[in-house]
Regions:
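Substrate-gating cap/lid region and adjacent catalytic-acid/histidine neighborhood
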Residues: 260-263, 267-398
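Non-catalytic accessory segments of hydrolases
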Residues: 1-167, 188, 298
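Alpha/beta-hydrolase active-site loop
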Residues: 161-183, 235-244
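Short glycine-enriched nucleophile-adjacent loop
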Residues: 200-212
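Short beta-strand immediately N-terminal to the catalytic nucleophile in serine-hydrolase-like folds
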Residues: 193-196, 220-222
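Surface-exposed acidic, glycine-flexible loop patches that form ligand/cofactor-binding
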Residues: 94-106, 132, 179-187, 210-213, ...
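A conserved short beta-strand
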Residues: 213-225
Length: 398
């Protein structure tokens, strides 16, 4: 519906005013944007570390003209803190709106983007992921924020803080899409979720989790899966206590730790979690998940749990069309780790097993040694692991 001041959409929770936008890619095909739409209550105070709380309806018209705050994280370009805990927003971009007067309803296919960033950084805002191309192809695009790092994935392995808050945020957003996307010209029966890296792992996890069943009808995972070695935290409770010690609280009491973490400003949590990157042991190991301290994890068997077993136990998952893949030389991200840990090349040269995926490192010592030698010979022949042969190492890590 068009009204003075911009397009108006009435959802099941209340009315929103958006903008009519001229696309940069196809100026002759304008679209409508509705930004900064809340899909859950702000997860602050007592709601920190809890599943998202349903949003209450409102009266009047809310502006949906600007993107909402991003969730707290370290901004990757400038390595600075950014965000606010009041961050559970999504954005909707649509090429056509229903017309109540004429009865016109476009019922367009819907794509929901789940951003990547190691479950620790990023947002769904248009800073990196603009809508013009997909909207120009006749798609209703939804992008979203979800809680990151400790705020999104810390687990005490109990009912109070069972973990996976960020994944549950995504579920809440998908429920919002099912309830409301028809008012933006989308078809709730043609929803495809897609994501990259941690977003791809999230997509695959939704295919496997019972709590996401029926919320989408197709999935695209770009460079990541639920079974990627970096996508699941082992012993997540220990990581929570490590975070407490990094913040100056040395306790073995779960309730005491939780009280402290709930009272700590989000900026301090984010910065302390960043210092945990690479703690303990061989922290530069290519397959180490310790370098990503807060990740999805297995939860206790409680109502609303996202996973109560490892993702592989849920395979094959939802019976929906699924597209997945990766790009050549994605392992170039390794160069950033080399900058932080210059001894890595020499360590890998001496202990090449460290680059072998865990799934190939099973069996007895002789079987593992044979696999290691075969992989090394395939990529390096007789050459050493050094900067002269960095392309080969990038290929291995890809």
């Amino acid at each position: 519906m068009r009204v003075g001041g911009g397009p108006l959409v009435t959802t099941r929770l209340g009315s929103l005013r958006g903008r009519r936008v001229v696309a940069r890619s196809t100026p002759q095909a304008p679209y409508y944007s509705f930004k900064g739409i809340r899909y859950a209550e702000p997860p602050r105070g007592s709601l920190r570390f809890r599943p998202p709380a349903p949003l209450e309806p409102w009266s009047g018209v809310r502006d949906a003209l600007e993107e909402g705050s991003v969730c707290p994280h370290r901004f990757m370009l400038f390595d600075t803190y950014k965000g606010d805990e009041d961050c559970l927003f999504l954005n909707v971009y649509t090429p056509a709106l229903p017309d109540l007067m004429s009865g016109y309803n476009p019922q367009l296919p819907v794509m929901v983007w789940i951003h990547g960033g190691a479950f620790a950084v990023g947002s769904g805002n248009a800073f990196l992921y603009g809508p013009d191309h997909l909207v120009g192809a006749g798609v209703v695009l939804v992008t979203l924020n979800y809680r990151l790092g400790a705020l999104g994935f810390l687990s005490l392995e109990n009912e109070e803080v069972s973990g996976n808050m960020g994944l549950k945020d995504q579920v809440m957003a998908l429920k919002w899409v099912q309830d409301n996307i028809e008012f933006f010209g989308g078809d709730p029966n043609r929803v495809t979720i897609f994501g990259e890296s941690a977003g791809a792992a999230s997509v695959h996890m939704h295919m496997l989790s019972p709590v996401s069943r029926g919320l989408f009808h197709g999935a695209i995972a770009q460079s990541g899966s639920a079974t990627s070695p970096w996508a699941l935290a082992k012993e997540p409770k220990n990581r929570a206590f490590e975070l407490g010690r990094e913040l100056g609280i040395d306790t073995n009491n779960t309730a005491e730790l939780l009280g402290y973490l709930r009272a700590t400003p989000s900026e301090l949590l984010v910065k302390a979690a960043a210092r945990l990157f690479g703690i303990a042991g061989k922290t530069a190991d290519l397959q180490s998940t310790v370098a990503l301290p807060f990740l999805p994890s297995v939860e206790p068997d409680i109502p609303g749990a996202f996973f109560t077993d490892e993702p592989k136990a849920y395979l094959p998952g939802a019976d929906v069309p699924f597209l997945t893949g990766y790009n050549a030389q994605e392992g170039i991200l390794l160069l950033r780790r080399l900058q932080r840990y210059p001894k890595l090349l020499n360590e890998i040269d001496n202990e090449f097993q460290r680059v072998i995926p865990p799934k190939l490192s099973t069996g007895g010592p002789e079987a593992v040694a044979k696999i290691v030698n075969q992989v090394r010979a395939f990529y390096f022949q007789q050459r050493p692991v050094d900067m002269r042969n960095i392309d080969s190492l990038i290929d291995v890590s890809t």
